[in-house]
A protein has these predicted regions:
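Short, amphipathic alpha-helical "recognition" segments used to contact nucleic acids or chromatin
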Residues: 40-54
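General nucleic-acid-binding
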Residues: 1-18
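Short, Lys/Arg-enriched anionic-surface-contact patches
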Residues: 23-42
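Short alpha-helical "recognition helix" segments of helix-turn-helix
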Residues: 58-63, 70
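Major-groove recognition helix of helix-turn-helix-like DNA-binding domains
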Residues: 46, 70-78
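Short, solvent-exposed alpha-helical "recognition" segments
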Residues: 75-88
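Intrinsically disordered, low-complexity basic tails/linkers immediately adjacent to helix-turn-helix/homeobox/MYB/SANT
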Residues: 87-95
Length: 95
């Protein structure tokens, strides 16, 4: 796994310090714009759908994501540092 950029360490630690979904929502509402939160959420949804074998066209229609976004997420799933897969696996385990 790649080492996180130094400037982001405090951010990652801050996120890890949160105890609940409510605390996380409050933090992200202060940290990000509504659009940024929507974009991040959309990417995670795209990753889940790609991981589930959905086709680009279905993902585009369901999520409203552009093919460029879908391609970028797919590239991260295939060649990235494993973050999407880690989160998707953890979400599957917690269901």
């Amino acid at each position: 796994m790649k080492q996180p950029i130094e400037e982001a360490r405090d951010l990652f630690r801050a996120i890890l310090s949160l105890d609940s979904e409510e605390e996380c929502a409050a933090f992200f509402e202060d940290l990000c714009t509504v659009k940024e939160i929507q974009d991040l959420s959309q990417r995670l949804q795209v990753a889940a759908m790609l991981n589930g074998g959905e086709k680009y066209q279905t993902i585009e229609q369901t999520t409203g994501a552009s093919t460029a976004t879908i391609s970028r997420v797919n590239k991260c799933l295939v060649y990235g540092s494993g973050g999407y897969r880690l989160v998707l696996d953890k979400q599957t385990e917690s269901k």
